[in-house]
Amino acid sequence: MRAGRVRPLRASDMKKDVRILLVGEPRVGKTSLIMSLVSEEFPEEVPPRAEEITIPADVTPERVPTHIVDYSEAEQSDEQLHQEISQANVICIVYAVNNKHSIDKVTSRWIPLINERTDKDSRLPLILVGNKSDLVEYSSMETILPIMNQYTEIETCVECSAKNLKNISELFYYAQKAVLHPTGPLYCPEEKEMKPACIKALTRIFKISDQDNDGTLNDAELNFFQRICFNTPLAPQALEDVKNVVRKHLSDGVADSGLTLRGFLFLHTLFIQRGRHETTWTVLRRFGYDDDLDLTPEYLFPLLKIPPDCTTELNHHAYLFLQSTFDKHDLDRDCALSPDELKDLFQVFPYIPWGPDVNNTVCTNESGWITYQGFLSQWTLTTYLDVQRCLEYLGYLGYSILTEQESQASAITVTRDKKIDLQKKQTQRNVFRCNVIGVKGCGKTGVLQSLLGRNLMRQKKIRDDHKSYYAINTVYVYGQEKYLLLHDISESEFLTEAEIVCDVVCLVYDVTNPKSFEYCARIFKQHFMDSRIPCLIVAAKSDLHEVKQEHSVSPTDFCRKHKMPPPQAFTCNTADAPSKDIFVKLTTMAMYPHVTQADLKSSTFWLRASFGATVFAVVGFAMYRALLKQR
């Protein structure tokens, strides 16, 4: 895989700023706490309310601007208080440790008031602040702990003294931390265990990081994980120390010197229990999660500009990544993914993205399992037809993390405008779309399935509800490997704009149906006669008795009149895989739309293209077998 720079935490990974509101009964020391923080000394004269204070990002531990807001019952109305509550990211409820009345008001007034004014679905963290600890020789924690256990929104409790400057900076650090690294989404204090959503997210992270898919993180994988998350590797002794901590508490936390999933989850539970939530949050955010433990839109759908008349393809680095992904899950090394292997691959997805139609869109083995070539073909198809979905899928697989790229947009090549290709009479594209047009029952499905090497016998086994309107496979033209994407266009009187857009058209008629060719001729005249899109007419079911077509001109004369190659005889009723000649011709026409019709009619032109395909198919098979031996 390509090495690159580590992606820093993006602005979207954490809140852009933190707004802290201090509330509590009069004279508990709210204003004094703020002024002591700012001036680093206890104020002799304290105003009724401190002005809003902004602490710049460069002086806070988390490098996030922080706004501290004071509340004064004497100066502000209930409406203003409600507005401040709605704007706050975290609220510090201040009480005086020497004033039982102010402690009682925490539960009788402040927590109910805050809960009434906040959305039930959005969790607003609370910090309980016991001020004036310099005035007593005892702690209020015995009284406060039951309150903390009752209200899960309470992140922590801090006892401090504005007069002695005790725990002042810690108080605001904990408040900031409660916003940026909240405990609530991660951990359930009552159960003393991580929440299901957190376990699910960390399990996905573990599976992505387990690059050899052996169920453990070995030293190399742990070091890579440490480096991409924290920008620093772990020393060998530090790695061993971590594993020893796990061994001490879990019998199955370490296996074969590697950290198991249970061990990985235990470590994060330990971080959270010891107040090191930021460690777990750093990992979660590095892998694309937001505060609700959902993958962010910025992570799944990075910006990718696609100008008109341009297409999207996977680049070389993306194919290398997908090859390694396939290898990771092809446990039996048969160059195909069984249903269980495919299910294992998709465990890092929130849903199974491929339906049964995919098995009839790409190449499969005799068992109907997607082959290595079929796997790459399906990704190629998704990239071409729906690049946003491709970005999403690559995001689930952790592409940007494992390849150390800014985002999965780096996996995509946006081709140049097709008009430039026509002007320069050459193309850099590797994927070509062919729309297959004809009346229902003319043999279009046979054409699509033949691209995948399936004869009529295999096609008859396809269930109607598993049928696909697409087929994609590689085709060699002049020694170059290209992808040909066939799209079965449903029969209709007029084609839509989307059904016309393609690189080449395959007009299919049934030689046994006298009314079949008329539709092809009509569609050609309506949409393609004056366009620059090359067309090829295919005479399907050519193994059967041919009847005369009920059209004013025969298919052969029609092709001659419109300077097209002659009709191509085609059948999928063969003992072995059907001939790929028409697919070489279609791909060649898509690659060289500027080639004259005289050249297209030339047998030597097609012979050169087909010869390159044959040679490279043989070479490709030899290389494939060599790869199999290596694996």
Swiss-Prot record:
Chain segments annotated as transmembrane: 606-628
GO biological process terms held by the UniProt record: cellular homeostasis; establishment of mitochondrion localization by microtubule attachment; mitochondrial outer membrane permeabilization; mitochondrion transport along microtubule; regulation of mitochondrion organization; regulation of neurotransmitter secretion; regulation of organelle transport along microtubule
Highest taxon in the source lineage: Eukaryota
Covalent link (Glycyl lysine isopeptide (Lys-Gly) (interchain with G-Cter in ubiquitin)) residue numbers: 166, 248, 585
Residues involved in Ca(2+) 2 binding: 330, 332, 334, 336, 341
Keyword entries, A-Z: Acetylation, Calcium, GTP-binding, Hydrolase, Isopeptide bond, Magnesium, Membrane, Metal-binding, Mitochondrion, Mitochondrion outer membrane, Nucleotide-binding, Repeat, Transmembrane, Transmembrane helix, Ubl conjugation
Domain Miro: 15-181, 429-592
Membrane topology, from the record: Single-pass type IV membrane protein
Catalytic EC class: hydrolase
Cellular component GO terms, alphabetical: mitochondrial outer membrane
Amino acids binding Ca(2+) 1: 210, 212, 214, 216, 221
Residue spans, topological domain Cytoplasmic: 1-605
Domain remark text: The Miro 2 domain is necessary for efficient ubiquitination by PRKN.
Family: Belongs to the mitochondrial Rho GTPase family.
The protein's name: Mitochondrial Rho GTPase
Lineage: Eukaryota, Metazoa, Chordata, Craniata, Vertebrata
Gene: Rhot1
